[in-house]
Swiss-Prot record:
PANTHER family: PROTEIN PHOSPHATASE (PTHR47992). GO terms for biological process: signal transduction. It catalyses: O-phospho-L-seryl-[protein] + H2O = L-seryl-[protein] + phosphate; O-phospho-L-threonyl-[protein] + H2O = L-threonyl-[protein] + phosphate. Activity not affected by inhibitors of phosphatases of the PPP family such as okadaic acid and cypermethrin, or by inhibitors of phosphatases of the PTP family such as sodium orthovanadate. One of its GO terms (molecular function) is protein serine/threonine phosphatase activity. Belongs to the PP2C family. Disruption phenotype: The stp-disrupted strain is 4 times less virulent than the wild strain, demonstrating that stp is required for full virulence of L.monocytogenes in BALB/c mice. Its cofactor is Mn(2+). GO terms for cellular component: cytoplasm; membrane. This is Serine/threonine phosphatase stp. Residues 1-18 have a biased composition (Basic and acidic residues).
Length: 252
């Protein structure tokens, strides 16, 4: 597996509340994670850092999980535990009241990839030169779009587009979505925060992923492109290809 992680403050925000990275368990099986924190007084970066650290630390203690079913079970259970830890910590610190974070994570299982998500950080797959979104946003705007109350055009500039219906650290229990999809040689997996998807149209995202650039260059182009369109939020990108091997590395 070859992975490239990038995170950038953007052009407007004073702090980067995104977090993520690539981490391996005892059998060198990787997990890739992106989290986008929220909350005032830098509480957002505490929440996203906790989510990534707690999930990756738990993963580092495991041995290889070989089936998609095993991985789904582990992700659901562990993310639930991570959520409880963030809630308890927020309750113990007055300055952190109201903090939370999105989370999207992926683990490879033989010829498949298992993805888990909470919030509006997304997972995409480029397969057969077509980019498709794997995850569903847990947001007010997505719900309005799903029920036909607003159009896609309305959604792009909706005044309440940042309101999440699910996030880690908000309530004692959280619903975690999981997806299992084929992941083949030459496919590219993209995990990202909304600082990318709110700035760069999916048609351009697809063109970048289909280009002849290296994976590292593609990651850099995503950050540059999002900033060129305004960089209104923190931008985080994690790209994964199956056909190369690279030792996992932490990043934040």
């Amino acid at each position: 597996m070859h992975a490239e992680f990038r995170t950038d403050r953007g052009r407007i925000r004073h702090h980067n509340e995104d977090n993520g990275g690539v981490f391996e368990n005892k059998d060198n099986q990787p997990i890739v994670i992106v989290a986008d924190g929220m909350g005032g007084h830098r509480a957002g970066d505490v929440a996203s850092e906790m989510a990534v650290r707690l999930l990756s630390d738990a993963w580092k203690e495991t041995t290889a999980l070989l089936t998609a079913e095993e991985i789904e079970t582990w992700l659901r259970k562990t993310i639930q535990e991570v959520n409880k830890e963030i809630v308890l910590y927020a309750e113990s610190e007055m300055d952190l009241n109201g903090m939370g974070t999105t989370l999207v994570a992926a683990i490879m299982a033989q010829s498949q990839v298992v993805i888990a998500n909470v919030g509006d950080s997304r997972g995409y797959l480029l397969q057969n030169h077509v980019l498709r979104q794997l995850t569903e946003d847990h947001s007010l705007v997505h719900e309005l779009l799903r029920t036909g109350e607003i159009s896609k055009e309305d959604a792009m500039n909706h005044p309440r587009k940042n309101i999440l219906l699910r996030a880690l650290g908000v309530e004692g229990k959280v619903e975690v979505d999981t997806f299992v999809v084929p992941f083949q040689t030459s496919d590219t997996l993209l995990l990202c925060s909304d600082g990318l998807t709110n700035m760069v149209p999916e048609t351009e995202m697809e063109e970048i992923l289909k280009s002849k650039r290296t994976l590292s260059e593609k990651a850099d182009v995503f950050i540059t492109k999002a900033n060129s369109y305004g960089g209104e939020d923190n931008i985080t990108v994690l790209l994964v290809e199956r056909d190369l091997t690279q030792k996992g590395r932490d990043a934040s």
